[in-house]
C-alpha cells in the first residue's frame, strides 16, 4: 500500500470539516486507501496474465456469448461508482477462450478509473486481439452514481454502450442475432 494514500484521505476529511480523530473515522483513511486500491487493481493486471494460455483449439465457428457479467467501476471524472452488466460475444476462428477469462477481462478493465465508452471498447479490442475472432461484440448497460447522486440526479437512468467488430459490424444479421440472444433487440 502506498504510504501516502492514507494521509491524503486524512487530508480530505480535514478539508471537508471532519475530525479524523473521532471514533468513527480513526481507521477511515487506511480503510479508504485499501478500498481504492482494490477498486483500481486492474492497473496491476494484463490481459496476457489473465488469459494465461487458456485458448483452446476448436472447430466451432458459431457465436459464443457470455452475458450478464456484473461489473463495478469508478467514473474517472468524479471517482464515483458505476454499476452494470456486460454482454460479450465472439465468433471463433480455430480457438476458443476459457469461459472465465471473458469475465476476468471485463473485471480487469472495470477495475480502473473509466468512462463506460472506453471500457466497452477496451474489452472488445482485447478479446479480438487475444482470440483473432471473426468478430467481437460488447454491450454494457450501467447506472452511474455521478449522474444519480449529484449533477442532474436522475435516479432511473441507464447508459448503454456497444462496440461491434468484424462480423458483428459488417453483418446486420449477425449483429441482430447477438442483440436478440441477449434480449436487446426490438423487432
From Swiss-Prot:
One of its GO terms (cellular component) is cytoplasm. Keywords: GTP-binding, Hydrolase, Nucleotide-binding, One-carbon metabolism. GO terms for biological process: one-carbon metabolic process; tetrahydrobiopterin biosynthetic process; tetrahydrofolate biosynthetic process. Gene3D superfamilies: 1.10.286.10, 3.30.1130.10. It comes from the Bacteria. Its EC number is 3.5.4.16. It catalyses: GTP + H2O = 7,8-dihydroneopterin 3'-triphosphate + formate + H(+). GO terms for molecular function: GTP binding; GTP cyclohydrolase I activity; zinc ion binding. It holds the Pfam family GTP_cyclohydroI. Transmembrane segments: none annotated. It is an enzyme of class 3 (hydrolase). InterPro entries: GTP-CH-I_C/QueF, GTP-CH-I_N, GTP_CycHdrlase_I, GTP_CycHdrlase_I_CS, GTP_CycHdrlase_I_dom. PROSITE patterns: GTP_CYCLOHYDROL_1_1, GTP_CYCLOHYDROL_1_2. Pathway: Cofactor biosynthesis; 7,8-dihydroneopterin triphosphate biosynthesis; 7,8-dihydroneopterin triphosphate from GTP: step 1/1. Homomer. Belongs to the GTP cyclohydrolase I family. This is GTP cyclohydrolase 1 1. It comes from Pseudomonas syringae pv. tomato (strain ATCC BAA-871 / DC3000).
Amino acid at each position: 500500500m502506498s504510504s501516502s494514500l492514507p494521509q491524503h484521505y486524512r487530508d480530505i476529511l480535514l478539508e471537508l470539516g471532519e475530525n479524523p480523530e473521532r471514533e468513527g473515522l480513526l481507521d477511515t483513511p487506511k480503510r479508504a486507501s485499501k478500498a481504492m486500491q482494490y477498486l483500481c487493481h486492474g492497473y496491476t493486471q494484463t490481459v496476457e496474465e489473465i488469459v494465461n494460455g487458456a485458448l483452446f483449439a476448436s472447430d466451432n465457428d458459431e457465436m459464443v456469448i457470455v452475458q450478464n457479467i456484473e461489473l463495478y467501476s469508478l467514473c474517472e471524472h468524479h471517482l464515483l461508482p458505476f454499476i452494470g452488466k456486460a454482454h460479450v460475444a465472439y465468433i471463433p476462428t480455430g480457438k476458443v477462450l476459457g469461459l472465465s477469462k471473458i469475465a476476468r477481462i471485463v473485471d480487469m478493465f472495470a477495475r480502473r478509473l473509466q468512462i463506460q465508452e472506453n471500457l466497452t471498447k477496451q474489452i472488445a479490442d482485447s478479446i479480438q486481439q487475444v482470440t483473432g475472432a471473426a468478430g467481437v461484440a460488447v454491450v454494457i448497460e450501467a447506472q452511474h452514481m455521478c449522474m444519480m447522486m449529484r449533477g442532474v440526479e436522475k435516479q432511473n437512468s441507464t447508459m448503454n454502450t456497444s462496440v461491434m467488430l468484424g462480423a458483428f459490424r459488417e453483418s446486420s444479421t449477425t449483429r441482430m442475432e447477438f442483440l436478440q440472444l441477449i434480449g436487446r433487440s426490438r423487432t
